[in-house]
């Protein structure tokens, strides 16, 4: 089967690498004019002139990035199956619709307001109590389109810096850790769930994801499973869905945002789970049985950002797996990730710190459960 992928970056690349053993072929449609997948057949189409050529080659279509024109995906749906559907993109690329969906399904979120002026932003900051986080309703990812207000008087500056006509303003959450759920749903409605991962962000960009969590209460995992299962069923979803959450001090979970695709916080599954998120996504969209999501060992994903480190020394570390994206170095750019696998979380922390020391731009590792090791 020829899988069509909208986008030609590292997520599409890793989908292809997971799909070749399944006998899949891949055709990428790149609308940026700057593809970086370095694999498969790429149709570069910044002027939207080659959609018919793309459709003629593929059997089913998926995507690696949700910030696509909904109209493009809806047009493709007239000709080929698209998984996840355009409805998932429509919700996930608009924070107002996303929050409304969470509210409708009784999935708790931080308190929020929708504002359309600097004056409304200031009023919302006073009502919710600072600090608050202001986010663009559309186009925000990896910390872009956001500002933290420490006082209501900062509203005018924040409004101007974000530069959007509508913002979501969220109350600041005193969380213990940021976590994420990765789940996959097949065409037949079967759903499977990966163990929850703890994520460490710096400047809004993910740096480390670790799973499974040694101190995670079973009930918390079950609650997260229920939340994401509700979303999967409501959207009649097919493929991998990621749900990012805050875990508070009392163990409750607050939904932050979701992503309708394979996700950076699920990269640990490539070496730390029986079936990777990439293979399971491909199984789902082709109507194949879903693979086991069981973790085989404590695993940490380390993002390599901006500048590569000493890869030779890194590969000398036992059970350390380097996944390079074949991209040129540039400040803030995701170049690769490293999956570190160990028999215990104590050993894992030691190995991740050894890996971190070999990366020039890697921040210190901070895990919420470190004191219990």
Task: Show which residues each predicted segment covers.
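ATP-binding N-terminal substructure of ATP-dependent carboxylate-amine bond-forming enzymes
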Residues: 1-93, 97, 119
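Active-site nucleotide/adenylate-binding loops and adjacent lid/helix of ATP-dependent enzymes
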Residues: 91-180, 184-231, 318, 352, ...
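Short, low-complexity Ser/Thr-rich regulatory SLiMs
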Residues: 183-187, 245-249, 326
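Protein kinase-like catalytic core scaffold
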Residues: 192, 241, 253-257
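Short, flexible active-site loops
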Residues: 204-214, 257-270
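Active-site "cap" helix and flanking loop/linker of ATP-utilizing ligase/carboxylase catalytic domains
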Residues: 222-243, 249, 259-307
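Peripheral (often C-terminal) accessory segments that flank ATP-dependent C-N-forming ligase machineries
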Residues: 283-373
């Amino acid at each position: 089967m020829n899988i069509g992928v909208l986008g030609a970056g590292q997520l599409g690349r890793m989908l292809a690498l997971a799909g070749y053993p399944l006998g899949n072929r891949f055709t990428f449609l790149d609308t940026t004019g700057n593809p970086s997948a370095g694999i498969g057949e790429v149709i570069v189409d910044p002027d939207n002139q080659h959609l018919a050529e793309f459709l003629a080659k593929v059997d089913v279509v998926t995507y690696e990035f949700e910030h696509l024109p909904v109209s493009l995906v809806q047009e493709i749906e007239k000709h080929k199956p698209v998984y996840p559907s355009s409805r998932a993109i429509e919700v996930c690329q608009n924070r107002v619709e996303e929050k409304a969906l969470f509210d409708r399904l009784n999935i708790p979120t931080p308190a929020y307001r929708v504002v359309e002026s600097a004056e409304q932003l200031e009023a919302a900051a006073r009502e919710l109590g600072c600090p608050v986080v202001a986010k663009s309703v559309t186009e925000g990812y990896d910390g872009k389109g956001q500002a933290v207000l420490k006082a209501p008087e900062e509203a005018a500056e924040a409004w101007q810096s974000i530069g959007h006509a509508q913002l979501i303003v969220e109350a600041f959450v005193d969380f213990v850790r940021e976590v994420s759920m990765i789940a996959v749903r097949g065409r037949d409605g079967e759903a499977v769930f990966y163990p929850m991962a703890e994520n460490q962000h710096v400047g809004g960009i993910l740096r480390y994801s670790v799973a499974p969590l040694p101190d995670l209460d079973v009930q918390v995992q079950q609650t997260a499973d229920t939340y994401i299962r509700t979303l999967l069923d409501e959207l009649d979803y097919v493929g991998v869905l990621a749900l990012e959450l805050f875990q508070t001090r009392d163990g409750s979970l607050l939904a932050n945002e979701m992503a309708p695709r394979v996700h950076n916080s699920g990269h640990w599954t490539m070496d730390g789970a029986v079936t990777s998120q990439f293979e399971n996504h491909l199984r789902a969209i082709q109507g194949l049985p879903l693979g086991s999501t069981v973790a085989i060992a404590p695993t940490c994903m380390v993002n390599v950002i901006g500048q590569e480190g000493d890869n030779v020394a890194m590969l000398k570390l036992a059970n350390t797996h380097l996944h390079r994206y074949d991209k040129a170095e540039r400040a803030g750019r995701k170049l690769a990730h490293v999956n570190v696998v160990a028999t215990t979380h104590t050993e894992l922390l030691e190995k991740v710190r050894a890996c971190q020391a070999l990366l020039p731009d890697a921040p210190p590792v901070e895990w919420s459960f470190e004191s219990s090791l």
